[in-house]
From Swiss-Prot:
Component of the type II secretion system required for the energy-dependent secretion of extracellular factors such as proteases and toxins from the periplasm. Part of the pseudopilus tip complex that is critical for the recognition and binding of secretion substrates. Keywords: Cell inner membrane, Cell membrane, Membrane, Methylation, Protein transport, Transmembrane, Transmembrane helix, Transport. Disulfide bonds: none annotated. Belongs to the GSP I family. It comes from Dickeya chrysanthemi. This is Type II secretion system protein I. It is found in: Cell inner membrane. It is a single-pass membrane protein. GO terms for biological process: protein secretion by the type II secretion system. GO terms for cellular component: plasma membrane; type II protein secretion system complex. Cleaved by prepilin peptidase. Residues 1-5 form a propeptide. The chain crosses the membrane at residues 6-26. PROSITE patterns: PROKAR_NTER_METHYL.
Length: 125
């Protein structure tokens, strides 16, 4: 007699294989969603850092050598930034370091950005 269909064991093995494949797809999707959230957070932090540096340039502020901190409401969240001026070999030029954190107490910054500023009123050579 010829067998038609699948045995119960074959059906159960097939179900296990499909279940494992489904879990793998679900896990990958969850990781991608988490990664997108982190990417969005890092992008916002970089925008805030760029905004702080642009504000210093527009206001023609000379960056202080100690950390100056503040906070800003951005994209519906409270963010914490701090800026420090760092001396360079040329006394008319300072490096500006900006760190941005979503959590004030976080040891690691969400974004760190460095740029350089020529002292206001001094011609660059």
């Amino acid at each position: 007699m010829k067998q038609q269909g699948m045995t119960l064991l074959e059906v159960m093995v097939a179900l296990v294989i499909f279940a494992l494949a489904g879990l793998t797809v679900l896990k990958t999707t969850a990781q991608q969603a988490n990664g997108l959230g982190r990417l969005e957070e890092k992008t916002f932090a970089l925008w805030i850092a760029e905004n702080q540096q642009a504000a210093m340039r527009l206001e023609k502020q000379w960056p202080q050598s100690q950390w100056v901190d503040g906070e800003v409401n951005f994209a519906g969240s409270l963010w914490f930034w701090r800026i420090q001026g760092i001396a360079t070999a040329d006394t008319r030029v300072r490096a500006i370091d900006v760190e941005v954190r979503h959590d004030r107490d976080s040891r690691a910054a969400d974004a760190v950005l460095r740029s350089y500023l020529v002292q206001p009123g001094e011609p660059a050579q």
